[in-house]
Amino acid sequence: GNGRFIFAGYKTESAPFDAATGDYNGGAEAITQQVDTARNMTISHTGQQIFESITSNAEQLPGGGYGQTNMFKILDSAIASLKTPIENDPAAATAQSQVIANAQIGIKNSQNNVLTVVADVGTKMNELEKLDTLGDDRALGQTKQMSDLVDVDWNEAISSYTMQQAALQASYKAF
């Protein structure tokens, strides 16, 4: 690699997520690049767009709302809950069940968002392949035009020009 962080937007010199807390520290703007004369394309999504967002059709938690949307914090919450002893403690067992149920919904929502981003990346890759093919077609056309200009059969060109000039002179005399 080049030593730069992915998912950090334009802040590629530092880690996008805090390893201890899961907080996003990357840039807010995704990296864009010009891919054609009149087309700029997002070439890298931020970690915030991928791991801290949900889709518009996300499932709500049983009590309403969406709760935590940061995938890492959702997983940390589930892990911490599973580490809590619940033996002979019905209240702790109920609380753990609720945390795990909420985590399942949160992970499903996060996974749907990740799949949406993956689909977006696939669409952009498809567009880049089409732009590449279009560029190859243009290059071939320009090579043919250049060949037509450079590889002229001068005898044929002069003969054709002379015949066209004679036809033009004849049309002038007809009027």
What do the predicted segments below correspond to?
Residues 1-63:
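Amphipathic alpha-helical coiled-coil/heptad-repeat segments
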Residues 1-12, 80-175:
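Amphipathic alpha-helical polymerization modules
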